[in-house]
Structures are given as C-alpha cells and as structure tokens.
Amino acid sequence: MKEIEIVEVRSGAQLEQALAIRLAVFVEEQGVSRALEIDGRDGEARHLLALQDAVPVGTLRLRRVEDGRVAKIERVAVLPAARGAKVGRRLVAAALSLARAAGAEAAMLHAQTTVQEFYGRLGFVAFGPEFIEDSIPHIAMRLPLREHTGQRDGLA
C-alpha cells in the first residue's frame, strides 16, 4: 500500500505543486475556466498537499469566512491515479483538524453534486438549493465543529 502524507504548504514550490494539481483536475479534466480556478484568493488561504510516496497527488485550500467563524474548504482536487486511495478523505480530515484548532465553529464547502455523497459520509449536510458554477452543479454543505451552546447561531 502506498503511504499518504498530508502536509501544510510552506513554500512557493509546494504551492506551485498544489496549483498544478488543481489545474490538471479542474481546468484540464473538468473544463473549468482558468480565470475561475485562479481566483486571487490563494494568498488568504491555508493550503494542504497530499503526498503519495512523496509525490504530490492531491490538494485543498482552507479559508476563514463569516467573520472567521466558519472554515471554508475549497479546491479539493485529487489526481485520477490516486483516486480511491482515501486521499480526499485524508485531506478533508486534516483541514477539519486545522479548522478546529483555529477555533472555527463550523466548516462549509460547495460540493460538486457528483461528490455530495462523499462529503455526506464525512458528516457534511447539504443546505440551500443546488446551483451552477461554471456549468457544473454544486450544493452548499456544512459541518458543525463545536458543540451547540443552546444559542441560535445559524450554523447548522
């Protein structure tokens, strides 16, 4: 079995590896516009890189939204050769750990509807109507990260 390691991006070279994975998956494979994929928000995000036997095979980015209370998981991408090896699951688990450590109350993401079930198995719940982004159907999903305090905070 190939070893999978999740690391936080700490260098420009690692960020380039992450961006190359995103371009391969979203732009080349799925036909997403490059302008939408490279949206100018990478500088405000933390990035994770999945290494399979030291080779970059997956990535995601994590941004704080809603006044920092919510961690938004974005740009989850795994190269085709590494799919089915739990790379995506490991990336999301690492992102949730970072979000909890940073004090986020919830995590959210916009899932392509073809992978909604994957995120559901990780505890995310869909909310709101389905929407189209760059010709691809998406659904917003959310996962509470802290115990409910009894106050209505609109997070779940």
Residue ranges and their predicted role:
Residues M1, G12-A24:
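A short, well-structured alpha-helix characteristic of acyl/acetyltransferase catalytic modules
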Residues T113, I132-A156:
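C-terminal "cap" of GNAT-fold acetyltransferases
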Residues L23-D53, R61:
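Active-site rim helix/loop that mediates acceptor-substrate recognition in acyltransferases
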Residues M1-G12, E147-A156:
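Conserved N-terminal entry element of GNAT/NAT acetyltransferase domains
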Residues L49, V55-R64, V70-A77:
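Conserved beta-strand in the GNAT
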Residues V78, G84-S97:
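Conserved acetyl-CoA-binding loop-helix of GNAT-fold acetyltransferases
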